């Protein structure tokens, strides 16, 4: 036995054995390799000093976008969990259960200082609030939940959020992050591509703005549908936006791709993305865009507080005096 153990009181042994330091206290920057204190990252919305934009949770997206960090959660419909009875090395319901547990643990950590849990059931989370005073429905895709894959639950969430934007005459903002369609749902997942497109058409018919914030990564069936159908496309720096990944393309064509291929800056140069915006300036940019696309007179939620200037009226001219003929 070590001599230190002989002289150390039992209570002190217990204190020394406890692991008080969290495992995720430090985060490595993918761009520079620098270790960054997590609290410092939270202050900068998870943008590293080297400019790398790390993936963030739906709750943090809402905090970034909504005025005063206040929003109204939107209840999303339930869908059949395993219509195809799909199974690979583990059953699909088991994968869903593990993904929900992972997200729940993250949500508990994020609400330690207060706040209600999001009660997230799949990769989509929706909320209603104001961005720069403009009423908006915001739908966030969570890559941590099975790679943000598009399935029936995500499709129903998108349609529900779009219909709420229609009902409230508000803007619709979607933050995408996905590896594509969910293979465990087969053709049922591919069906969500045209279904979400029809929901976007309804917004266009109502002349309501649909703004897409492309985050890393946005790929597969998501990039081939609602991610690239916005009125305005805003992308975060360095985000991969593609249908197939660069490695798959290189193996297919047996050629090297240009530097930065399929990154947001490359797509902006080619005209597929309107603007690339640092996350710390995202809210101001989205608010400015919505302010142009959704005129004040059409914001239903603000009509009771609008200071409308009454139309100018002209007083009727007094009748000309009748002149008696001489």
Curated annotation (Swiss-Prot):
EC code(s) of this entry: 2.1.3.15
**Does the keyword section mention rRNA-binding?**
no
Family under the similarity heading? Belongs to the AccD/PCCB family.
Protein keywords: ATP-binding, Cytoplasm, Fatty acid biosynthesis, Fatty acid metabolism, Lipid biosynthesis, Lipid metabolism, Nucleotide-binding, Transferase
Which Gene3D superfamilies would you find in this protein's record? 2-enoyl-CoA Hydratase, Chain A, domain 1
This protein's GO cellular component annotations are: acetate CoA-transferase complex
Under the subunit heading, UniProt states:
Acetyl-CoA carboxylase is a heterohexamer composed of biotin carboxyl carrier protein (AccB), biotin carboxylase (AccC) and two subunits each of ACCase subunit alpha (AccA) and ACCase subunit beta (AccD).
**Name by which UniProt lists this protein:** Acetyl-coenzyme A carboxylase carboxyl transferase subunit beta
Carries keyword S-adenosyl-L-methionine?
A: no
What highest taxon heads this organism's lineage?
Bacteria
Instruction: State a single Gene Ontology molecular function.
Output: acetyl-CoA carboxylase activity
User: What's the stated role of this polypeptide?
Assistant: Component of the acetyl coenzyme A carboxylase (ACC) complex. Biotin carboxylase (BC) catalyzes the carboxylation of biotin on its carrier protein (BCCP) and then the CO(2) group is transferred by the transcarboxylase to acetyl-CoA to form malonyl-CoA.
Tell me which InterPro entries the record gives.
AcCoA_carboxyl_beta (IPR034733), Acetyl_CoA_COase_Trfase_b_su (IPR000438), ClpP/crotonase-like_dom_sf (IPR029045), COA_CT_N (IPR011762)
Mind telling me which PANTHER family this protein's record contains? ACETYL-COENZYME A CARBOXYLASE CARBOXYL TRANSFERASE SUBUNIT BETA, CHLOROPLASTIC
Skewed-composition ranges (Basic and acidic residues): 317-326
HAMAP family according to UniProt: AcetylCoA_CT_beta
Pathways per UniProt: Lipid metabolism; malonyl-CoA biosynthesis; malonyl-CoA from acetyl-CoA: step 1/1
List where in the cell it is found: Cytoplasm
> Which catalytic reaction applies to this protein?
N(6)-carboxybiotinyl-L-lysyl-[protein] + acetyl-CoA = N(6)-biotinyl-L-lysyl-[protein] + malonyl-CoA
Region (Disordered) residue ranges read: 298-326
């Amino acid at each position: 036995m070590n001599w230190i153990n002989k002289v150390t009181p039992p209570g002190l042994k217990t204190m020394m054995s406890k692991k008080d330091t969290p495992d995720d206290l430090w985060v490595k920057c993918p761009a520079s390799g620098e270790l960054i204190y997590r609290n410092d990252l939270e202050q900068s919305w998870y943008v590293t000093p080297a400019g790398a934009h790390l993936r963030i949770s739906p709750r943090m997206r809402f905090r970034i976008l909504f005025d005063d960090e206040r929003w109204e959660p939107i209840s999303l419909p339930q869908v059949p969990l395993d219509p195809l009875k799909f199974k690979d090395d583990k059953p699909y319901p088991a994968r869903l259960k593990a993904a929900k547990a992972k997200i729940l643990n993250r949500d508990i950590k994020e609400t330690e200082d207060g706040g209600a849990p999001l009660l997230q059931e799949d990769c989509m989370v929706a909320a209603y609030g104001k961005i720069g005073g403009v009423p908006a429905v915001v739908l966030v895709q969570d890559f941590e939940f099975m790679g943000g894959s598009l399935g029936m639950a995500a499709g129903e969430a998108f349609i529900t959020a779009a219909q709420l934007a229609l009902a409230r005459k508000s803007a619709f903002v979607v933050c995408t992050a996905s590896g594509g369609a969910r293979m465990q749902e087969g053709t049922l997942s591919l069906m969500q591509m045209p279904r979400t497109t029809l929901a976007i058409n309804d917004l266009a018919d109502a002349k309501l703005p649909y703004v897409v914030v492309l985050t890393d990564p946005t790929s597969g069936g998501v990039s081939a549908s609602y991610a690239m159908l916005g009125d305005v496309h805003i992308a975060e720096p360095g985000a991969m936006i593609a249908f197939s990944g660069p490695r798959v393309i290189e193996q297919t064509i047996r050629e090297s791709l240009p530097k930065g291929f399929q990154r947001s800056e490359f797509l902006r140069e080619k005209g597929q993305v309107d603007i690339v915006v640092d996350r710390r300036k995202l809210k101001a940019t989205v608010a400015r865009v919505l302010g142009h696309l959704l005129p004040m007179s059409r914001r239903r939620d603000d009509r009771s507080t609008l200071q409308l200037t009454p139309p100018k009226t002209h007083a009727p001219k007094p009748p000309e005096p009748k002149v008696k003929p001489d």
